[in-house]
Amino acid sequence: APPPPTPTATASANLPDVGGQKAVQLRRLQSGVGATPEFLSVTLLPGRGMNVFQITAYLPGRGEVSLLASKSLDTAAKIMNGGPDDLDGNASFSMGGALLFPFANRLVGPITVDKNTGDHILTATWHGRSVPVIANWHGKQPGAPWCGMHGQMLAAKADNVSVKADSDTAAAIADYRLPANGHWFSDNDVKVTVALDRDTVTAIMTATNRGDKSEPVGIGWHPYFQLPSGSRANARLRIPAAMRVEVNNFDDVFPTGKLLPVSGSQYDFNVLEGGPLPDTLVDDSFVDLTPNAKGDVVSEIRDLGANYGMRVTAMSPHIRAIQLYSPIDKSFVALEPQFNYGDPFGKEWSSADTGMVTLAPGESVTWKVQLRLFQPANDMVGQAPHPNFQ
């Protein structure tokens, strides 16, 4: 047999502008003989807060497959345009994998309307300090209340982007200066690193408080993982969580402050081989997470119709919640590892720790998640070590 091709990793910026900056693609050649899955590319949007826009992999019997529910870059450039449907960068969390900072999920609070701009403004209060945060989201029902959604980095442009590649690994690094402009508790720098090799895609965000006051920060990610078989019924999920956050309804999705045990419910995804999704919209936050011996929280998405597995390992101890979003009529599962619970400053939580990390001036915190591919059929018969034992 001919030798497998020599793996080479490259980084290309010869791609369309999205958000005013060129998209970046990390790419490597398939190195194996086709028996096992391997990552091939990652496409990133530095002009849109380093959205992890697409990931592709070689899957045995299927060839190169897109792993995220996303659009074409040309379509993204048209949609991510700052227009009415892209308020505060909202289009970024409708596809690909938006990075979320300085909070993930929703902020709820008193709303006022700016008479000059028409913007809805939310008052966020932390330790007696209040700041006006742009409310960029509301539910679909008539009169649904406005809230802040998924942070303030969705449409951020990178201050600089660098790429590096060696024989089998490619990485992109982007730096974001995020002044509060009065809309957060301090100024921040965020450094994003995304690395690709055969077996892993790793995303790292490090936030540093560059202001002169302490602040709370939350970091998260919103990847829409595609089910290659195209059928939601084939999905099996593992999320090692004891509790689920109760919400007022699935339109607002505002937490009530109550945690519901998952044990014995259709939201119990603790079994090693994964559990099926309920036959209903899932838009739930799972908390009280159980780490493995290394201190990592390992979640898995399996697609039994494609012998496909995606292992999502949260490698920061500050990741306290995993949001799961899966509409009944779609073939994706958004699995979102994040620091904070929804509405982390809400009175409904009383004195509970809702996962926001306090940074004094000059302090930093890091969020890290790693993706790994596996084949459930092989995994089930013990040919691949389970992540808890690696």
Describe the predicted segments one by one:
Residues 5-204, 210-216, 223-390:
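Surface-exposed acidic/polar loop and edge beta-strand patches at domain peripheries
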